Amino acid sequence: MVEPAVLYAVAAVFVAVLLFLAVKLRGGQEQQPADDGQRRGAPRPRTDAERAAGAPRRVRGARQRLQAARRINQQDSEGDSDSDEGRPEIDIPEGMKVGAKKMKKLEMKAEKKAAREAAEQEREERKQREKMLEEKRKQEEEEEKLEEERRAEEERKAKEEKAAREHEEYLMMKEAFTVEEEGHEEILDEDATENLLQDFIDHIKAVKVVLLEDLAAQFNMRTQDCIQRVQELREQGRLTGVIDDRGKFIYISQEELQAVAKFIKQRGRVSITDLVESSNQLIHLIPDTEQVIRVQSS
């Protein structure tokens, strides 16, 4: 049987342990609320607005302007891309704080600069266009001047060739048309030669059909010179007609040639026989007696 003293000792130890545990547990609960109170009482971090509210007025105003400028820049960057392309770029040093008013001034300054540059570019482009137009005008004037000089040179050469040809023809006519009197030849001047040549042409037109040998004798010419003269007049267009194989020249006027051409055009296809049969009506071969007398008397 256990002694009472031992039981009392065990009970005392058990009670002491219980009291220790109870005190320990209560102390932990009181410390936790105290810690919570300390944490709740500790100052929390302030926001930008709270810091700005507690800052001096000047610093607070500068910060507000900077924030407004940032918001404006952010809104501009989020705007339409087309408006961004037309907005001039503003060079702001890195780290530099710019307010809204300052930013507006910088934008206006940049816009004026861009406008000046655009106007300057427009002036340069206009100068280039005017320069090109002036060069083109000068080139056209130079080409026109060269063309006029070329035409003038061609006209001058044509006149010289015509004068030389007329002089040569005059020499040939002067050699062909001579008047033999008392064993010597009288050389005609230019006017007399031209008059005699006109009489020569008028006589052929009046007679219509002339024997070249008789024509040469009538105008005191060699037959070969007379034939050559008729051919030259035909080439010059002063006589129209044909020379047959018997040495006759048949004069055909321009009106008669047009009548023959009209006849052929109306008939479409014309045989030689039809043309010969109709030639008496289209071409008049009867001499003009009055004209012949007038030429011979001149």
From Swiss-Prot:
Keyword line: Endoplasmic reticulum, Membrane, Transmembrane, Transmembrane helix, Ubl conjugation pathway
Compositionally biased tracts (Basic and acidic residues): 105-140, 147-166
Compartments, record wording: Endoplasmic reticulum membrane
Residue ranges annotated as motif UFM1-interacting motif (UFIM): 176-190
Superkingdom of source: Eukaryota
Lumenal membrane side: 1-4
Cellular component GO terms, alphabetical: endoplasmic reticulum; endoplasmic reticulum membrane
Membrane topology recorded in Swiss-Prot or TrEMBL: Single-pass membrane protein
Gene3D superfamilies: Winged helix-like DNA-binding domain superfamily/Winged helix DNA-binding domain
Cytoplasmic-facing ranges: 26-298
Gene Ontology molecular function terms on file: ubiquitin-like protein ligase binding
Parts of the chain that traverse the membrane: 5-25
Chain segments carrying region Disordered: 28-166
InterPro entries referenced in this protein's UniProt entry, alphabetically: DDRGK_dom-contain, DDRGK_domain-containing, WH-like_DNA-bd_sf, WH_DNA-bd_sf
GO biological process: protein K69-linked ufmylation
Domain notes: The UFM1-interacting motif (UFIM) specifically recognizes and binds ufmylated RPL26/uL24, resulting in stable association between the 60S ribosome and the UREL complex.
Family: Belongs to the DDRGK1 family.
PANTHER family xref list: DDRGK DOMAIN-CONTAINING PROTEIN 1 (PTHR48176:SF1)
Descriptive protein name: DDRGK domain-containing protein 1
Organism: Branchiostoma floridae (Florida lancelet)
